[in-house]
Amino acid sequence: QHNTVEHCDMVELDEELVDMVKVHMKEWHHDCFDDPRANLVHKDARKWVEDHKGANYDVILSDLPGPIEGGPALYLYTKEYFQHVAEALSDDGVFVLQSGACNETYPYCFAAVHETLGSLKEQFPYVRGYYGLVTTFQMPWGFILASKKHDPLELTPELIAQRLAERGVTTNRYYTPRFHSAMFTLPEYMLRAIKQHGRILTDDEPFLWEA
């Protein structure tokens, strides 16, 4: 959608799932798999990141299943993985990942991931949590942006509107310039959860989703 994108690697372990999406969810992907800028690979995401140290990605997005015991994403929420991500990013790169529920009954995954990324101050000086309403989950869902140089809280509605216009983005149904700051305003219960339940996740002690 953004005309500034020159190349995009999509790393997805489940080839069968992608084939299903291509056929049955065109209203979501809008034939993006046919875009010449897109490169789809079916490999383990962690190994891909580890093998691409120095690749200078401007952005890495981790849209993953939860860290379930025995699941494929268990070690994609740990400090070691985040360090590999930092090494694969450019000097002003940005990392974004979905981080679990952002509701009052189960804020634990988000709190732990936020604390873990926050511990990597040398790699990611800016760590900002935000949330959105995901209709398929029927609850607010959390995301975290970790950046080497750019603080999303410094973006004004005017600057966001200008950038979207320059990039030819006109069809957003959720994210808008006026909504930007609201997304990054976490509820008070989430701020308390980060303080009370935040912990550093490692390969030896990963987060195990129990909800």
Located regions from the model:
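Conserved Class I S-adenosyl-L-methionine
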Residues: 82-83, 108-134, 144
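Conserved beta-strand edge residues that scaffold enzyme active sites
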Residues: 102-103, 134
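Soluble small-group transferase modules, centered on the S-adenosyl donor enzyme superfamily
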Residues: 126-211
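The AdoMet/dcAdoMet-binding core of the Class I SAM-like
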Residues: 1-94, 104-117
